[in-house]
């Protein structure tokens, strides 16, 4: 929803409205992400049981999910920044940020999982820290451009602005949510069959996610 709302404002030459959209997006999603992260960290044990994690993988799964849940604000911050870039007509910069994050992620995975032998926790640390890198890169670029100036008042919640963002964004979120729920159900069924089946399904889901990149970018 943010990308569309910013695009409309920029297209109309209304930088003040674009600033309000950006400020309200930051307020809405960053506060929401912190609350969500705290809730999920508190529920990590029930979640691990809910998805029927094989006994031998419980400890690793718990560590992995805990670190990933703590990193939710980083994921949210990057997505907010990426939507701002795209709303201003720049789809290349987010691609560069993600490319850099992927390189960092691979390097950190080798370090944490290979050198330090941290296992699943190391993989989660690599992912979370690489996401933080993408956020820092995006922030540096967007602060240098100064194409849209923000004031403190832009971060004050405005009902009309948030309604516009959510009215466009919620249907898209619901669409993605349905897909993720179906994958979650498949994961639960695979976990119930044992560690080998769970690993196989995990690999296939990664491949499917890669194949979906092209149609999802249309």
Regions found by a protein language model. Give the residues of each.
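Hydrophobic/aromatic residues in alpha-helical transmembrane segments
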Residues: 2, 43-44, 81, 108-109, ...
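Short alpha-helical transmembrane segments in multi-pass integral membrane proteins
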Residues: 6-73, 115-170
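Hydrophobic residues within alpha-helical transmembrane segments
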Residues: 27-31, 35, 70, 96-103, ...
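Hydrophobic transmembrane alpha-helices of multi-pass small-molecule transporters
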Residues: 105-110, 134-139, 210-213
